[in-house]
Amino acid sequence: MIGADDLRRLTAGRWLVPLLAHLADERGSRFAVMLKRLGLSRSVLAASLAALQAAGWLIRNPGHGHPLRPEYVLTRAGEPVAAFCQGVMAQREKLELAPGQLPRWSLPLIARLDAEQARFSALRAALRPITPRALSLTLKQMLQVDLVDRALEDEFPPIAIYGLTGRGRALAAAMR
């Protein structure tokens, strides 16, 4: 598993995980190939590549190709992160989850719930700087695709406790 900071940086962009998984599968790729394979717009792909370069996980291949057709390769620091992304993407496909079904905070949330069940306030504290609205929407989407379960404690007032379902534990196992 990668560190919490790397996981947050990785999930900051919707396409960073699929992009790194593709780069790991192909051992590098050209811009045009990534555009076609992932079906992204040029601006989204350029922004995603810039974010990966800023993280130090990706570089332009200095000894290849024409400047207008750049190729990108993983750095040594990017290889373990890309391997992590491959595992997540493989498990996502097994679970038949579309990219839109895993919102930005879903992977950090699964990593947190892998340790133990938690209340909303504990999740919010662990996932800072998440907003209450973002956490609520993420939990709602994760409940809809059966990755997270919600149980109510028998107290007054009732307290919601969130935990992983079997599908959620399978995805968490791919993240370890």
Feature-to-residue mapping (PLM):
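Histidine- and aromatic-rich ligand-binding microenvironments
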Residues: H66, A90-A98, L152-F156, R176
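Residues within the DNA-recognition helix of helix-turn-helix
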Residues: S48, T138
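N-terminal helix-turn-helix DNA-binding core of bacterial DNA-binding proteins
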Residues: I2-V44, P99-A134
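A short, conserved structural fragment
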Residues: Q53-G63, L143-E153
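Short, Lys/Arg-enriched N-terminal segment that forms or immediately precedes the first helix
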Residues: M1-R9, E79-A98
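Amphipathic alpha-helical recognition patches that constitute DNA-binding helices
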Residues: R69, V73, E96, P108, ...
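Transmembrane alpha-helices
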Residues: M34, L45, R76, F84-C85, ...
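Basic, amphipathic "hinge/linker" alpha-helix immediately C-terminal to the N-terminal HTH DNA-binding motif
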Residues: H64-Q86, F156-M175
